[in-house]
């Protein structure tokens, strides 16, 4: 339905906004991996790939990806583990999703509108 799409699009715009903030600090990344519950939706991953205008890779066993990533980070900072290379294994890719070029221009305009609405209503968040 339209309401479901609006929610997915709004969350995706929020993710795009975060990625744009990261790009402001460091634009030197090419690989983006998708993990977690949202990765079960090929529709959503394709929408994100289009918004980000980047290929997204779905990791094998992506439902465990976030927890595994946190566990690996914890192990990486553990001074008792001397061989740090054993922690990081090559990520197995289950599927890749490419941007939909026809939709990119449309979503880019909608993102600018979303950003304008977000900024103009920012003061209301403190009241709510």
For each feature predicted by the language model, list its residue ranges:
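Glycine/Thr-rich phosphate-binding loops that ligate phosphate moieties of nucleotide
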Residues: 1-128
């Amino acid at each position: 339905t339209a309401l479901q799409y609006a929610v997915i699009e709004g969350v995706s715009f929020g993710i795009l906004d975060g990625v744009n903030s990261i790009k402001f600090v460091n634009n030197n990344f090419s690989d983006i991996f998708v993990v977690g519950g949202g990765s079960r939706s090929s529709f959503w991953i394709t929408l994100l790939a289009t918004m980000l205008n980047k290929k997204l890779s779905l990791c094998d066993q992506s439902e465990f990806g976030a927890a595994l990533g946190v566990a690996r980070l914890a192990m990486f900072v553990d001074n008792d583990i001397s061989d740090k290379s054993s922690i990081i294994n090559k990520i197995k890719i289950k599927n890749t999703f490419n941007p939909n070029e026809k939709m990119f221009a449309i979503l880019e305009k909608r993102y600018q509108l979303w950003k304008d609405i977000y900024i103009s209503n920012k003061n209301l968040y403190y009241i709510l």
